[in-house]
Curated annotation (Swiss-Prot):
Source lineage: Bacteria, Pseudomonadati, Spirochaetota, Spirochaetia, Spirochaetales
Name the record gives this protein: Phosphoribosylformylglycinamidine synthase subunit PurQ
Catalytic activity: N(2)-formyl-N(1)-(5-phospho-beta-D-ribosyl)glycinamide + L-glutamine + ATP + H2O = 2-formamido-N(1)-(5-O-phospho-beta-D-ribosyl)acetamidine + L-glutamate + ADP + phosphate + H(+); L-glutamine + H2O = L-glutamate + NH4(+)
Species of the source: Treponema denticola (strain ATCC 35405 / DSM 14222 / CIP 103919 / JCM 8153 / KCTC 15104)
The entry's keywords: ATP-binding, Cytoplasm, Glutamine amidotransferase, Hydrolase, Ligase, Nucleotide-binding, Purine biosynthesis
Pfam family, one: GATase_5
Record's subunit section: Part of the FGAM synthase complex composed of 1 PurL, 1 PurQ and 2 PurS subunits.
Length: 270
C-alpha cells in the first residue's frame, strides 16, 4: 500500500501540483488539501504519513513570507502538527514551505516531552529566520546543493550533489546567535549547503555570489530537526524529477538525485 501524503494548500501556494507529481513518481499517494478543509474537520491529519508544505506566496506573503501560513499551523493545528512531527513522520517544506516551518518554530525545533514547541506568537520561540536576499532581488535559476553529514532522513544517504531551481526573494537563512548556528552543526541539523564553483569536489560556496544565491549564513540551503524527519529547504527539488531521453547522462544523474530525495522520504514510512 502506498503511503498517503498530505500536500498542504493555502491561498497563494503554487507548487502543489509539482510536489504531488514528485511524490507520485517516488511511490506515494499524494492529496492536495486546502487548509480550510482541515480547519472544518473535513480532512484528518491522522490519515496521512507524509506532510509537504509546498512553495509559492502563501497569503501574498503579507506580514512576511510564510508568516500567516505559519500562524495557521501554530494556532489552529498546534496539537496535530506537534504529534505528526513527534511521531517521526516525514515532513518537507520547500521555499515558502521552509519559511513556514521556520516561522512556526517547527524548525530548527524546540521540544518538550517529545513534542515540538510551536510558536503561537510568531516570534517568541524563533531561533532562525529566512529574510530578504542579500543581493536585494528575486533569484530564479538552477543552483547546486551539497548534502551534508546530518540526521536528515531525506538527504543523508544521497550520493552526489543536487541540482534544482531556486525561485525566491526571501531565502537568506539567519540565526539569532552564533550559538544557535553552532548547535545546528553539532546536532547534525545542517542537511544541505550551496555548492561553489568547485561543488563537484564537495566545496561549498563560502558565501560567494551567485553560488550562494541569497547570502545565507554558512551557505545553508536546508536544515532538519534533531530527529531528522523534518526538512526545510529553499531550492525546488520537485522541479527536476522527470528524466527525458534527450538529456545527457550527467543531466539524467542530476535528475535522479532529486527524485532519490523524494524516494527517501517515501521509503522511510514503508
Amino acid at each position: 500500500m502506498k503511503p498517503r501524503a498530505l500536500v498542504l494548500h493555502a491561498t497563494g501556494t503554487n507548487r502543489d501540483g509539482d510536489a504531488a507529481r514528485a511524490l507520485e513518481l517516488a511511490g506515494a499517494e499524494p492529496e492536495i488539501v486546502h487548509i480550510n478543509k482541515l480547519k472544518a474537520k473535513e480532512k484528518n491529519w491522522k490519515d496521512y504519513e507524509i506532510l509537504v508544505i509546498p512553495g509559492g506566496f502563501s497569503y501574498a506573503d503579507a506580514l512576511g513570507a510564510g508568516k500567516l501560513f505559519a500562524l495557521d499551523l501554530s494556532n489552529y493545528f498546534f496539537d496535530e502538527v506537534s504529534e505528526f512531527v513527534a511521531a517521526g513522520k516525514p515532513v518537507i517544506g520547500i521555499c515558502n514551505g521552509f519559511q513556514v516551518l521556520v516561522k512556526s518554530g517547527i524548525l530548527p525545533g524546540k521540544e518538550k516531552d517529545g513534542k515540538v514547541i510551536l510558536d503561537k506568537d510568531g516570534y517568541k520561540n524563533r531561533q532562525a529566520t529566512l529574510t530578504y536576499n542579500k543581493q536585494g532581488r528575486f533569484e530564479c535559476r538552477f543552483t547546486t546543493m551539497i548534502p551534508q553529514k546530518s540526521n536528515c532522513i531525506w538527504t543523508k544517504d544521497l550520493k552526489g550533489n543536487i541540482h534544482c531551481p531556486i525561485a525566491h526573494g526571501e531565502g537568506r537563512f539567519l540565526t539569532d546567535s552564533q550559538k544557535t548556528l553552532d548547535d545546528l552543526f553539532e546536532k547534525g541539523q545542517i542537511a544541505l549547503v550551496y555548492g561553489g564553483k568547485d561543488a563537484e569536489k564537495s566545496i561549498p560556496a563560502n558565501g560567494e555570489y551567485p553560488f550562494n544565491p541569497n547570502g545565507s549564513l554558512a551557505d545553508i540551503a536546508g536544515i532538519c530537526n534533531t530527529k531528522g524527519n523534518v526538512l526545510g529547504l529553499m531550492p525546488h527539488p520537485e522541479n527536476n524529477v522527470v528524466i527525458r531521453e534527450r538529456d545527457s547522462e550527467e543531466e539524467k544523474e542530476r535528475t535522479k538525485l532529486c527524485l532519490d530525495m523524494w524516494k527517501a522520504g517515501v521509503n522511510y514510512v514503508l
